[in-house]
A protein has these predicted regions:
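PLD/PLD-like phosphodiesterase catalytic module centered on the HKD motif
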Residues: 2-326
Length: 326
């Protein structure tokens, strides 16, 4: 396969890896959600499982669009006008498919998320997800129309306020499309690091010589160094990438069907999530990512939030029902 330069980053919980340096990032895992796709007569497409700090998988009794549910409660600060106007609070939302439906250039990252910071509370929250047109800034209708059709993933972590700049700098090479940038006066200096749309000309992207496949890069990182099973969206346009099966080196094998306890089984064609799980039991890494394994996306910027945890990795390994094996 042709080798080429591409832009990417990998955000490891506890270690930030930019391919040129490693900086400690004191993050705390909050939750992972896996939403089911719509399945006629079985699922509405709003059911989901929840993995919290205790690392136990549960099916949540509320639907994902519930205004009193975990997503709504996590995003409550951006729904509340009094909080948004607070001097020491700020947030950004970024997406290659924003809620207003506008078209976003491919020069921006194929990435979606919300980043909130509260200087007074000395904390921040980062929610990385795969859902188009999400979130709308209304607690009662924050979930998008059409959001039930396909499976989606969400990962949420918290961090100390002083780590905000490091996280922002690690995101810069992915050039996310930021649609609202809202912050109080005292947070402005720090949040200006995330004013991508105003400072793109000043960014020096991180470069990595690779095949252009984020998941091949993850598999070959010294911290991971494992074969991977990978779930990504099977795009209707473009050429999907086959499993990566080098004679030497780490394999990256596409998942073809998924089975999630409490939700059921579905095919890759119904799953818009992007995640990978290591097969080496001594290196229990799980990543929730931005980009798909498709030729059209090998030049697209994006990254992943990864966590090394045996319980989470064991859970995600069980999701693999069938794969395109080498």
């Amino acid at each position: 396969m042709r080798r080429e330069w591409f832009h990417s980053f990998l955000q490891l919980i506890n270690v930030w890896v930019s391919y040129s340096q490693k900086v400690s990032v004191f993050s705390s895992f909050r939750f992972i959600l896996y939403k089911a796709p719509y399945q006629r007569g079985q699922l509405t497409g709003l059911e989901y499982i929840y993995i919290g700090p205790d690392k136990v998988l549960r099916r949540n009794s509320k639907l994902i669009n519930d205004p009193r549910g975990i997503l709504a409660n996590t995003l409550r600060p951006i729904f509340t006008s009094t909080m948004v106007s607070v001097t020491d609070f700020g947030f950004i939302s970024y997406s290659d498919q924003p809620p207003d439906g506008r078209s976003v250039s491919n020069t921006h990252g194929h990435s979606k998320g919300v980043l909130m910071v509260d200087k007074t509370g000395d904390q921040g929250v980062w929610l990385l997800h795969s859902t188009p047109r999400f979130p709308l800034r209304d607690q009662n209708i924050f979930w998008p129309n059409g959001g039930a059709a396909n499976a989606q993933t969400f990962i949420c972590v918290t961090f100390k306020y002083d780590q905000f700049r490091a996280i922002g700098n690690s995101m810069k090479p992915t050039c996310p499309h930021v649609y609202p940038l809202t912050f109080g006066r005292s947070s402005q200096r720090s949040l200006c690091d995330l004013s991508f749309k105003y400072s793109l000309s000043n960014i020096s992207p991180v470069l990595l010589l690779t095949v252009g496949d984020l998941y091949v890069s993850i598999a070959s990182l010294p911290e991971v160094n494992s074969d991977l099973y990978v779930q990504t969206w099977l795009e209707r346009s473009g050429t999907p990438a086959k499993s990566f099966c080098p004679p030497q080196g780490k394999k990256v094998q596409n998942i073809e069907s998924i089975h999630v306890t409490g939700l059921g089984e579905w095919e890759r064609t119904k799953d818009h999530s992007k995640w990978c799980v290591a097969t080496d039991q001594n290196r229990p890494w799980t990543c929730i990512a931005d980009v798909n394994r498709a030729d059209s996306q090998f030049k697209r910027r994006g990254g992943a939030l990864c966590i090394m945890d045996k319980d989470i990795t064991d859970t995600f390994s069980l999701f693999v029902m069938r794969a395109e094996l080498c």
